[in-house]
Amino acid sequence: MNIINKILVLFFAIILNTNTAFSAEKWDMALAYGASNFHSANATEFAKNVSDKSGGKLTIVTHPGGSLYKGGEIFRAVRTGQAQIGERFMSALGKED
């Protein structure tokens, strides 16, 4: 194998590995309730299903118990792009525009 072929093989190996590394995406999901609460359990199951159905291209990491944002801050955090996804009762958003 001459030097040009070796360089081409190395180049394509780097490109393929770089593409694979950047194709997976991770989202943080803010949850107000503790991990044992059924809302958080449902969110965890949802996150698992998303990862399975997307073939691992999208992984959602749940943050229960207000560990990422407190309940009253979740809507603002998602709205402003600080968190990609969050769970909050719709009735708590009654005064939001």
Regions found by a protein language model. Give the residues of each.
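Short, glycine-/small- and polar/acidic-enriched structural segments
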Residues: 26-97
